């Protein structure tokens, strides 16, 4: 089986989606022929067991992006195209180009269709994007991939596409160095972007409730 992933960036600074495609590409590449279409950046992550193709950035006034992606589709002839990310015209156009060739498309929004995201810049950015390309992209995808049950339920509430599968994110355990010392320390680590969406409010509330039991513990919050 031949699979093409499209993702806007695999740069180290791009966050969780870059790490996701790095882990996925390494393991999926052992089972299928995997190609990744993306855009050049200063610090791209290395991804094993797959071929990376850099294309021009999307520009509605130029045709280089469309020409390059179409050429890759013609040469590679994939069985499946997997689009990662949304709210970017390039993602929708990759999907359109694939489906014009009757190639099945999986669409993974990576949490970018959560209610709180949609509400941000709703009238100035989200509504125009939905009307121009994003709504049709969601409706026409052969399958939507959610990473958790809560995300699936929010996608169902949108009412655009009910064919949703949950595929949870994995980690590359081989790259994790084991601790040499297991000395117990009274320390809790919250490692994430500092935002209510990441559940930091639950940690704060729980710590307050368990204040007496947590005497002597240190809570470390690390993230943007």
Q: Residue spans of the language-model regions?
A:
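Carbohydrate-associated surface elements
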Residues: 40, 150, 170
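A short, basic/aromatic alpha-helical/loop segment that forms part
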Residues: 14, 173-175, 195-200, 213-214
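Conserved donor-binding/catalytic core segment of Leloir-type glycosyltransferases
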Residues: 2-4, 145, 180-209, 219-220
């Amino acid at each position: 089986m031949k699979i093409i992933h499209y993702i806007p960036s695999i740069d180290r600074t791009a966050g969780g989606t870059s790490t996701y495609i790095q882990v996925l590409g390494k393991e999926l590449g052992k089972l299928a022929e995997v190609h990744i279409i993306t855009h050049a950046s200063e610090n791209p992550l290395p991804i094993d067991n797959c071929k990376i193709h850099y294309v021009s950035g999307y520009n509605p006034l130029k045709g280089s992006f469309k020409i390059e992606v179409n050429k890759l589709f013609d040469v590679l002839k994939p069985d499946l195209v997997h689009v990662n990310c949304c709210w970017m015209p390039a993602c929708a156009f990759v999907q359109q180009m694939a489906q014009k060739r009757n190639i099945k498309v999986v669409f993974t929004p990576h949490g970018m269709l959560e209610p709180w995201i949609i509400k941000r810049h709703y009238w100035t950015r989200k509504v125009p994007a939905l009307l121009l390309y994003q709504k049709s992209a969601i409706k026409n995808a052969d399958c939507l991939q959610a990473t958790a049950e809560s995300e699936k339920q929010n996608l169902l509430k949108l009412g655009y596409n009910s064919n949703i599968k949950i595929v949870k994110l994995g980690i590359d355990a081989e790259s994790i160095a084991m601790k040499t010392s297991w000395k117990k320390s009274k320390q809790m680590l919250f490692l994430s972007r500092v935002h209510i969406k990441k559940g930091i409010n639950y940690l704060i509330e729980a710590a307050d409730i368990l204040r007496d039991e947590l005497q002597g513990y240190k809570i470390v919050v690390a993230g943007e």
